[in-house]
Amino acid sequence: MMKPTIVLTIICLVAAAALAGTYQFTKPMIDAINERMAAEARMTVLPTADGFEPVDTELQDGVIEVYKATNGAGVVVTSGFKGFGGLVTVMTGFDADGVITGVAVTDASDETPGLGSKATLPSYTDQFVGATAIQFNDASGDGTRIDGVSGATYTSTAVFTAVNAAIAQFAELGGAL
């Protein structure tokens, strides 16, 4: 008769092997879906582009990746900063003159539903379109004033900071490549 400890160990090993096998089997499909969604988001924030290629450059703090349009239409910068529940990932499109053409929150899955998720809606992100420099509405200085989202301060600040990081990255690149 086997001891309960040995039986439980065998069950755990079989379950772990099954989980690892499932992960290895589904990983290529998940990666393909994620890449397709990222490509669609890039087209959303820079609709005049005909395709994208990655840019090999030194990344600013918070910047995850940079893509340039293959037709010279502009650049898309993906950046992320901590919101209330976790990392908020934002994709920002710039035309060749450095004007923001679109902002899309690509991941805010850990933010509070109903509150933090408001910062992912076009009613918030569309404020950035057409700007070259931004600031929160209660700040002083140059730039387009951006209203925060009441009840979603952390999330709207994360989006704002991510867009500012994208602006800094675009400036570091010297504009569209």
Predicted regions and their residues:
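Flexible, solvent-exposed loop/hinge segments and secondary-structure transition points
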Residues: M1-L177
